[in-house]
Regions:
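An alpha-helical, amphipathic repeat domain used for nucleic-acid recognition
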Residues: 1-197
Length: 197
């Protein structure tokens, strides 16, 4: 069994965790609380249990830029978008990580980035015009079930219903690419530089 934690041990654990993982202040605080629960707290020379200030320790690491919620949110949002996840999924992931509301809003994708992520997911999962030709042809029930399943998959991934509906109704991949391109043009960013994850 590992010994109880003193203030130096907590500081070392916090530094090790921040060095090893991209994290938020809230996650680091939860990690330290969990470690205290697992191992307990050490006693001082008088036999009293120490009372560490975890919030102050986390605040100090934030002050030293070892923990940066903004950088975490930016990186995580970009990563999820590049994997084809939608805005709702990104927001939920950041909220779960303890990122504050203003930062979540600041890193929410724009319309063009949302469309781009939806198109990427459809391409990866072979949905809509990216799917296998002839699947369910002639059987309206099979077509309807496949469409409902595809819509559900896109909604679970955090995409807007309108985006899922448009992509699944598209006849050709070029139609989807044009739709994504129009959103980038409307944002004044034809190359997709500003409105990215």
């Amino acid at each position: 069994m590992k010994p109880p934690l003193g203030e130096a041990n907590l500081r070392d654990l916090a530094l090790h965790y921040a060095a090893r993982f991209a994290t938020t202040g809230a996650r680091l605080e939860a990690y330290l609380v969990r470690k205290i629960r697992e191992r307990g707290l050490a006693q001082d020379d008088d036999g009293r249990t120490i009372d560490p200030d975890i919030r102050a320790l986390v605040a100090r690491l934030v002050e030293l830029s070892y923990v940066d919620d903004d950088a975490y949110a930016r990186s995580r949002a970009r990563d999820l978008g590049a994997r084809g996840y939608g805005a709702r999924r990104v927001e939920e992931t950041l909220r779960h990580a303890g990122v504050a509301e203003p930062l979540r809003q600041a890193h929410a994708p724009g319309e063009a980035a949302s469309r781009q992520a939806a198109a990427l997911m459809a391409r990866k999962r072979r949905l809509g015009p990216y799917g296998v030709s002839g699947l369910g042809k002639g059987d309206p029930l099979a077509i309807r079930k496949a469409r409902e399943k595809a819509v559900a998959a896109m909604l679970r991934a955090g995409h807007q219903y309108e985006h899922a509906r448009y992509i699944l109704a598209a006849q050709r991949p070029e139609d989807v690419e044009q739709w994504v391109g129009e959103a980038f043009e409307d944002s004044g960013d034809e190359e997709g530089i500003k409105d990215q994850w």
